[in-house]
C-alpha cells in the first residue's frame, strides 16, 4: 500500500479566518458586532430598516433552535449611508464600514433577481465574505419563494459563519442512487415531492410528469422537483429552509452522502451539522438552559460620515536609506492627489522620536488644497522612532478639527522598530479609529499588524518592489460602497532602463472607466522623455506632465474630461548617461455612477502562514456582482528578503479553486523563503477579446422554490426572473487592473528556498461514462505539490458498492494504470479502461475514485466518487412518462455518467 501523508496539518490551517476583518464576537452564546450595511445607491426607505430588524429578530429565534439552544443574535448594527438624511437616533460608527460588513443591502447588477446569497469561495469550514440581500427581497413578500426572511438569513449565516454549503444542485437536480432509483438532489431524503415539467405561456402555466431521457437514464432537461408543502422531515436548512417543518441541519444520521451537491463535494461527505460543531464558535459553546433566546436582538443605527484620513508618516533616520523617504513621499503624493476622494477631510502627522502635526484636517475641494498638503511632506529624515507618539498626534489632529476619532482612518507608515507600541494599544482600542499599516522594509515594528487587525484596517508590506508603496496607498480607497469613489489602478510597472534607451508599453482603457485618469512617471536620477498617445492618435509630451515641486522625482498628467476608450501607448527615454529605474502608474475612476466598472480585489486565505502548510491566493474579478471570466490573472508575492514569486491564478474548479467559472481565481502558495512579512499584488488582464461576463445565478444562495403541492394540487410560484437588460453582454472589452492584496506573515520557515513538501491536490471533478464495454474517465490533472508541477502516477480503484469505495478505498479493486502518464497541473486528463474482472450486464453499476502520487511518494486525498452504469437505450416510444413520486423509479437497465462529489 502506498504511504499517505497526514494532511491534518494544512487542512487545519484552512479553518483559520481569511484576510477580511470581522468584528463579530460570540460571547456567552450571543453574537455581537454584526454589521448590516446599506449601499449608498439604495433609496432612503424607513420600511427597509424596520424589515431588517424584523428579519434578524425572527432569525435569532430560528437560529437558537436550529443550533440546539447554542447561539443567537444579540447586538446588530445597521450602517446607513451618507446619502440618507440625518436623524437624531443615528449614532457615529466606529470601525464599522460597508466594505467590511457581514451583510450588504444592494441592488443586483443587470436586474439579476433577488436571490439572497453569500459570497463564499473558501474551503469547507472557512468563513465567507459577505451576505447580499437586495432591497426588493427585504421590501416585498417572498414567503412562498424563499420562506420567511428570517429563515433565509439563517441559511445564509450558515454559509458565512461556518463555511458550509448548499445541499441542492441547480446544475444536477437529480441523480441515481445506489438503489438504482432517481432521487432529487437534497438532504434529507425524507423530504417528499413530485417531479414535473412546467410550461408557461401568456401568464399561465401548466405541468406534466417528467419523462426519463433515453440516453442518460435521468429525467429530461428542465424537470423540476416540487415539494409537498406539508412535511414531517426536520432537515435540512441548507436544502429548503422554506418548508415549515424544516428546523434543523442534517446530522450524520440524516445526511444524504450520495447527493451530488457542493456540501458533499467540499466537505468530504460530512453533514452540515458535523462541520458546524467543529467550528471555533461551537468548540467551547454549550447549550443554554433556556428554551428560548434570552433576549431579542439590540439594534444600533449608525450613519456613515464623510471620510476622515490622517497620514502618520515616519521620518526617522533610517528613512534616509534606500530612497525610502523619496518613495514614501511619491506614494503619499499620489494618494493625496489621485486616491482620496473630494469632500474628504485629510490631515498629516510626521514622527521620529517626537511627533509633529503638519496639517490639521483640511477638506479636499480642489487642486490647491492638494498642493498645500503635499507641500508639507517631510524633506529630511533623522531621529528615532516613536510610533505611539505619531498615533497620538494623529488623534490630536483629528480632534482639534472638531472631528471624532470614531470611524476616522489613520494611514501609519514606518520602517523602524519601537518597543513601546504596547503602551498605546488600549488608547487605540478606545479611539474607534481604523488604522491601515504600511511596513517599509524588514525592520519595521512587528506589532504593526496588531494595530491594523484590531481596528479593521488594511495591512501592507513594501521592500524591494519600488512600486510597493504606491500599490499600498492605491489600495486604501473609499470604504463606503460607492462605485464613483473607488480608485482603480490600471498600471504599476517598474522598468530598469539602460542609458539612452527607449521603453514602450500599452494600457487599455475600457468603457466602464475613464473619469479622473492620471498617468504618473517617476525616476531615480533624471526625468525621462515621455511620449503618450491616446487611442485616437492625440499625443502628450514631457511638457504636458506636471512635475512635483518637492524634488521627489515624479511627474503626472491628468487627462481632461473622460479618457478615450481603447489602447493608450506610452514611450519613455532614459536620457541620462547611466541606467536608472523608471515607474509608470495609471489610475482612474468609474465612467458612470450607474454602470459599475470591472474591479479586481485580492487576498490570502489567512493573515498568518505556518511552514510547511500552504496558503491560498484569491483574486476576485467582477463587474458589479457579475463574475468576469476568460482572463489572465497573475499574482506576484514578494518575500521579506525581496525575492518575488509569480503565480498564474486559475478559475478551473480544481486544486485551490472551489467552483469553476465563478470569477474567483486562486492558487496554492508553498514557495517559502524564510520567515517574516510577505506582500501580495495581483494583475488581471483581458486581451484579444477573451473576457466575458457570467450571467449565471450565484452559488451559495437560498433556493428559489418553484412551487408546492398542497392537498394534492400543484401551486406554482412565479418563474424565476431572467436577465432582460439590453445592456447585458456576455463579452466585455479588453482591460487591465492591478491591486494590492496586502501582506501576510510567515513563521516556522527555515532560511533560504524551502518549498513545502506536500502531496498533490485532491481531484474534485472526476467524471465517468461507459463507451461500449469500456469506462472513460476525465478529470483535471493535479500536481507534484498541490497544484504546482505534475504528479508522478495515479491510483484508480473501482467498486460496485458506493459505501465500500468511500469507506475502504485501499481495498477496492485496483485498475491497471501503467499506460497513464500524468500531465502538467491544470491539464485535462483522460483515461479509458475495461472494468475487469467484473461481469458487465445491462444495469451494471460502477463507482470509481482516483488518488495522485508525487515523486516523494506522497498521495493525495481520494477524489470525488464518479458513477458509471452500463445500459442499452430503449426505443424512444417505449420510455414511460414517469415522474410522480421520487422514490418509485427503478433504473436497473439504465446507465449514465455523473459526478457524485462525495469524498
Swiss-Prot record:
Signal peptide range in chain numbering: 1-21
Sequence intervals crossing the membrane: 883-903
Sites carrying sugar chains: 360, 372, 504, 842
Residues covered by region (Metalloprotease domain): 45-199
Record-linked SMART domains: VWA
SUPFAM superfamilies per UniProt: vWA-like
Tissues in which the protein is found: Trachea.
Post-translational modification: Glycosylated.
Family note: Belongs to the CLCR family.
Listed name of the protein: Calcium-activated chloride channel regulator 1
Source species of the chain: Bos taurus
Amino acid at each position: 500500500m502506498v504511504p499517505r501523508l497526514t494532511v491534518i496539518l494544512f487542512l487545519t490551517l484552512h479553518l483559520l479566518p481569511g484576510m477580511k476583518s470581522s468584528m463579530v464576537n460570540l460571547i456567552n452564546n450571543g453574537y455581537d458586532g454584526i454589521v448590516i450595511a446599506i449601499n449608498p445607491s439604495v433609496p432612503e426607505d424607513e420600511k427597509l430598516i424596520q424589515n431588517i430588524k424584523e428579519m434578524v429578530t425572527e432569525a435569532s429565534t430560528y437560529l437558537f433552535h436550529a443550533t440546539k439552544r447554542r447561539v443567537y443574535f444579540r447586538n446588530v448594527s445597521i450602517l446607513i449611508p451618507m446619502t440618507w438624511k440625518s436623524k437624531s437616533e443615528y449614532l457615529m460608527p466606529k470601525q464599522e464600514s460597508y466594505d467590511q460588513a457581514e451583510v450588504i443591502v444592494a441592488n443586483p447588477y443587470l436586474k439579476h433577481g433577488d436571490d439572497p446569497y453569500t459570497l463564499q469561495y473558501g474551503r469547507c469550514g472557512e468563513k465567507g465574505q459577505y451576505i447580499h440581500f437586495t432591497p426588493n427581497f427585504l421590501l416585498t413578500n417572498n414567503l412562498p419563494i424563499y420562506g420567511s426572511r428570517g429563515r433565509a438569513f439563517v441559511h445564509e449565516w450558515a454559509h458565512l459563519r461556518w463555511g458550509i454549503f448548499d445541499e441542492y444542485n441547480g446544475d444536477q437536480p437529480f441523480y441515481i442512487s445506489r438503489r438504482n432509483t432517481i432521487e432529487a438532489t437534497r438532504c434529507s431524503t425524507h423530504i417528499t415531492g413530485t417531479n414535473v415539467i412546467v410550461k408557461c405561456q401568456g401568464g399561465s402555466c401548466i405541468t406534466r410528469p417528467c419523462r426519463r431521457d433515453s440516453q442518460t437514464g435521468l429525467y429530461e432537461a428542465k424537470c423540476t422537483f416540487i415539494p409537498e408543502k406539508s412535511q414531517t422531515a426536520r432537515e435540512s436548512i441548507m436544502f429548503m429552509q422554506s418548508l415549515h417543518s424544516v428546523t434543523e441541519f442534517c446530522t450524520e444520521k440524516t445526511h444524504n452522502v450520495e447527493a451530488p451537491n457542493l456540501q458533499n463535494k467540499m466537505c468530504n461527505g460530512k453533514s452540515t451539522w458535523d462541520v458546524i460543531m467543529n467550528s471555533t464558535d461551537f468548540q467551547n459553546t454549550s447549550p443554554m438552559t433556556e428554551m428560548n433566546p434570552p433576549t431579542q436582538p439590540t439594534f444600533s443605527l449608525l450613519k456613515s460620515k464623510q471620510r476622515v484620513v490622517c497620514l502618520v508618516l515616519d521620518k526617522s533616520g533610517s528613512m534616509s536609506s534606500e530612497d525610502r523617504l523619496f518613495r514614501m513621499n511619491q506614494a503619499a503624493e499620489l494618494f493625496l492627489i489621485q486616491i482620496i476622494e473630494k469632500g474628504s477631510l485629510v490631515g498629516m502627522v510626521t514622527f521620529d522620536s517626537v511627533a509633529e502635526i503638519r496639517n490639521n484636517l483640511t477638506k479636499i475641494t480642489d487642486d490647491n488644497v492638494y498642493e498645500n498638503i503635499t507641500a508639507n511632506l517631510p524633506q529630511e529624515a533623522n531621529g528615532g522612532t516613536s510610533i505611539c507618539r505619531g498615533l497620538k498626534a494623529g488623534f490630536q489632529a483629528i480632534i482639534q478639527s472638531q472631528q471624532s476619532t470614531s470611524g476616522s482612518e489613520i494611514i501609519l507608515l514606518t520602517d523602524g522598530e519601537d518597543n513601546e507600541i504596547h503602551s498605546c494599544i488600549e488608547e487605540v482600542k478606545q479611539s474607534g479609529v481604523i488604522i491601515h499599516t504600511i511596513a517599509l522594509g524588514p525592520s519595521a515594528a512587528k506589532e504593526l499588524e496588531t494595530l491594523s487587525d484590531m481596528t479593521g484596517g488594511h495591512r501592507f508590506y513594501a521592500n524591494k518592489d519600488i512600486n510597493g508603496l504606491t500599490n499600498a496607498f492605491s489600495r486604501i480607497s473609499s470604504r463606503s460602497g460607492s462605485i464613483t469613489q473607488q480608485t482603480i489602478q490600471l498600471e504599476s510597472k517598474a522598468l530598469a532602463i539602460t542609458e539612452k534607451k527607449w521603453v514602450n508599453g500599452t494600457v487599455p482603457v475600457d468603457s466602464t472607466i475613464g473619469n479622473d485618469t492620471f498617468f504618473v512617471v517617476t525616476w531615480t536620477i533624471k526625468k525621462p522623455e515621455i511620449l503618450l498617445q491616446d487611442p485616437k492618435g492625440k499625443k502628450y509630451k514631457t511638457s504636458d506632465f506636471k512635475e512635483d515641486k518637492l524634488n521627489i522625482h515624479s511627474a503626472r498628467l491628468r487627462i481632461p474630461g473622460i479618457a478615450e476608450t481603447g489602447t493608450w501607448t506610452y514611450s519613455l527615454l532614459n536620457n541620462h548617461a547611466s541606467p536608472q529605474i523608471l515607474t509608470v502608474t495609471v489610475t482612474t475612476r468609474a465612467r458612470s455612477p450607474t454602470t459599475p466598472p470591472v474591479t479586481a480585489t485580492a487576498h490570502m486565505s489567512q493573515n498568518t502562514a505556518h511552514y510547511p502548510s500552504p496558503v491560498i491566493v484569491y483574486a476576485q474579478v467582477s463587474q458589479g456582482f457579475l463574475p468576469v471570466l476568460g482572463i489572465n490573472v497573475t499574482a506576484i508575492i514578494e518575500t521579506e528578503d525581496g525575492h518575488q514569486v509569480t503565480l498564474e491564478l486559475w478559475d478551473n474548479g480544481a486544486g485551490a479553486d472551489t467552483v469553476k467559472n465563478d470569477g474567483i481565481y486562486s492558487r496554492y502558495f508553498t514557495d517559502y523563503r524564510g520567515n517574516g512579512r510577505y506582500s501580495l499584488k495581483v494583475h488581471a488582464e483581458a486581451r484579444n477579446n477573451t473576457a466575458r461576463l457570467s450571467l449565471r445565478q450565484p452559488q451559495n444562495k437560498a433556493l428559489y422554490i418553484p412551487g408546492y403541492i398542497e392537498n394534492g394540487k400543484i401551486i406554482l410560484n412565479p418563474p424565476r426572473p431572467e436577465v432582460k437588460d439590453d445592456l447585458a453582454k456576455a463579452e466585455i472589452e479588453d482591460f487591465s487592473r492591478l491591486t494590492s492584496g496586502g501582506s501576510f506573515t510567515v513563521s516556522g520557515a527555515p532560511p533560504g528556498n524551502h518549498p513545502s513538501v506536500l502531496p498533490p491536490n485532491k481531484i474534485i471533478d472526476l467524471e465517468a461514462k461507459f463507451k461500449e464495454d469500456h469506462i472513460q474517465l476525465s478529470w483535471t490533472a493535479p500536481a507534484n505539490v498541490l497544484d504546482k508541477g505534475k504528479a508522478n502516477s495515479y491510483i484508480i480503484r473501482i467498486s460496485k458498492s458506493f459505501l465500500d469505495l468511500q469507506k475502504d478505498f485501499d481495498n477496492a479493486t485496483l485498475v491497471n494504470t501503467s499506460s497513464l502518464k500524468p500531465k502538467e497541473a491544470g491539464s485535462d486528463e483522460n483515461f479509458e479502461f475495461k472494468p475487469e474482472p467484473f461481469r458487465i450486464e445491462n444495469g451494471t453499476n460502477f463507482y470509481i475514485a482516483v488518488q495522485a502520487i508525487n515523486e516523494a511518494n506522497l498521495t493525495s486525498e481520494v477524489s470525488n466518487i464518479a458513477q458509471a452504469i452500463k445500459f442499452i437505450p430503449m426505443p424512444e416510444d417505449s420510455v414511460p412518462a414517469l415522474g410522480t413520486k421520487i422514490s418509485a423509479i427503478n433504473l436497473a437497465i439504465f446507465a449514465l455518467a455523473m459526478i457524485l462529489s462525495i469524498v
